[in-house]
Amino acid sequence: DLYKRQVISDYTVTEKMIKHFIQKALGKKSFRKPLVSVCVPSGVTEVEKKAVEDATFAAGARDVKIIEEPIAAAIGAGIDISKPCGNMIVDIGGGTSDIAVISLGGSVVSTSIKIAGDDFDEAIVRYMRKKHNLLIGERTAEDIKIKIGTCYPLAQPETIEVRGRNLVTGLPRTITVSSEETEEALREATLQIVEAVHSVLEKTPPELAADVADRGIVLTGGGSLLRGLEELIEEKTGINTMTAEQPMTCVAIGTGKYVEFLAGKRDEEF
């Protein structure tokens, strides 16, 4: 696979993919070498960053700028990261969740955990197998998550009909699943994200922690769309929590705007 848990594992294929996108953006006949910004999880090592850089240069880049996911997410969410105040971003992707407190254009405290949106689907699959002896696929689990999934009690519980294979008889079976059951299924994964948020807050300098308390926590990434996540984090931390306007595209938009941010920073220095 090209990606394992949203981290690049095949650099030869990565190089070819980046080359394809460069040609698509500039045209095959273009002789210009572009400046490319590449986003990576905050937990990657310097060796992994260097490997990404090398693959991007080999694909035809003139220069490469590496940006950590929380920084990209913050820029994409419309946060001015150049200010000396603290902003907290929780970016929940498919394979990793990146949590960071950002100030003066960089991460002050950050962590990356391999618990994210894909784990929500897997948790529902496991729950259905254990609780109902029902085998369902990840696509069905995702459908359950989107339609009635929650990690916080709903004012009005919801239900959905789920079809799968009975593990006892081997025959098709349809059951009714409630939103309360998804809350139970997702509890462990979502609480691990909350614990990571706690951990970052505990390591944050007092002045920046006070800024976060005033400004709130911003959620980005597809995983942030899980119902109840705002309420759960807010309840456990006591800090106002909100989801960015377009959470699924924040990282992509921020990665694109990062070069502009660096150019503005250089202008300020001169």
Describe the residue ranges of each PLM region.
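Nucleotide/phosphate-binding catalytic cleft detector across ATP-hydrolyzing
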Residues: 1-92, 100-218, 224-270
